[in-house]
């Protein structure tokens, strides 16, 4: 797994320059409401959580979420003395399932103190090996440090679960971690091919357009515009202290990246342009999941992005 301080990220982002590779995106999605983003359908679309973003480009230090970014790929269950543990190695298919896990620190003792990151102390993600079934959940923690994430219907196959957090004390205080484990959902698994690239898509009647030239291992801006019936959307609502939440997973190994918004929330009037700080460490195809909210309803768009 990985951890990093906010200062290292800022230095790296400020130093990043260069020409960009070709960008290709596929967008497909379905919307829903709620504070978690489940995606039971296995068609590379997704069923939402809650979200939002706007435009503008403040300094790196002023960007929402820019104080919380991590290095690495999120594919390990341990980093710098912290470990993600769980007794759940299998989960049932076709129905809701509770996944329980614990983060341990010094002396293998459960960690119970976590700092807020985008209004939550823990962000939990689940995705199948073919990058379908995306779910973004904010689990609950018991006094003993055991977290419970309520997952919606899971399709058979191999899944990876990610825990994103920042300890508020101990050796990892102020560092951002993303640890992960795999879990199996028994049954006859059918792989869904990654959709072909495109630059726009229809999501619950909204048109999402993506522009940008991200290059592997370098910091680049990425913009998303939202329109409906040919008109710019300007009523995006806040979600997790932003107007949109954007998560990415690399094809083949499920490497994790969180693309951070670069504008501040000013009320229920976000959009139509959403700006992000994109730093994808590896070349190849990435599956992006953009979450935004309007009228109290969450919409989640699935994006296929090729990074050179």
What is the predicted function of each stretch?
Residues 189-258, 274-289, 293-294, 299:
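Surface-exposed interaction/gating patches
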Residues 14, 28-80, 184-196:
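N-terminal low-complexity, Pro/Thr-rich disordered segments
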Residues 110-114, 170-179, 232-236, 298-302:
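Beta-sandwich strand segments
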Residues 1-28:
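Sec-dependent bacterial lipoprotein signal peptides
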Residues 96-109, 163, 219-231:
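Beta-strand-rich structural segments
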Residues 133, 143-148, 267-275:
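Aromatic sugar-binding surface patches on proteins
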Residues 141, 148-155, 280-281, 292:
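Residue-level recognition of secondary-structure-to-loop junctions
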Residues 70-96, 198-218:
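N-terminal edge beta-strand
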């Amino acid at each position: 797994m990985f951890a990093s301080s906010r200062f290292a990220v800022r230095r790296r982002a400020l130093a990043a320059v260069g020409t960009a590779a070709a960008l290709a995106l596929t967008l497909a999605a379905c919307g829903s409401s709620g504070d978690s983003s489940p995606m039971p359908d296995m068609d590379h679309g997704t069923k939402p959580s809650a979200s939002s973003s706007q435009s503008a480009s403040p300094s790196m230090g002023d960007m929402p979420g820019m104080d919380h970014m991590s290095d690495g790929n999120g594919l390990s269950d341990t980093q710098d003395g912290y470990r993600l543990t769980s007794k759940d190695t299998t989960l049932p298919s076709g129905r809701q399932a509770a996944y329980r896990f614990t983060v341990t620190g010094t002396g293998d003792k459960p960690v119970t103190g976590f700092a807020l990151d985008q209004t939550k102390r823990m962000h939990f993600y689940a995705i199948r090996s073919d990058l379908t079934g995306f779910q973004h959940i904010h689990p609950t923690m018991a006094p003993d440090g055991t977290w419970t994430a309520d997952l919606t219907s899971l399709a058979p196959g191999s899944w990876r679960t990610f825990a994103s957090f920042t300890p508020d004390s101990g050796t990892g205080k102020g560092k951002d971690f993303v640890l992960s484990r795999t879990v199996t959902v028994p049954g006859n698994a059918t792989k869904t091919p990654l959709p072909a690239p495109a630059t726009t898509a229809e999501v619950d009647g909204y048109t999402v357009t993506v522009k940008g030239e991200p290059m592997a291992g370098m910091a680049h801006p990425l913009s998303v515009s939202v329109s409906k019936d040919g008109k710019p959307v300007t009523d995006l609502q806040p979600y997790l202290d932003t107007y949109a939440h954007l998560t990415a997973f690399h094809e083949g190994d499920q490497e994790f990246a969180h693309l951070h918004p670069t504008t501040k929330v000013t009320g229920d009037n976000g959009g139509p342009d959403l700006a992000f700080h994109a730093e994808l460490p590896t070349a190849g195809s990435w599956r992006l999941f953009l979450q935004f909210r309007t009228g109290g309803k969450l919409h989640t768009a699935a994006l296929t992005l090729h990074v050179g």
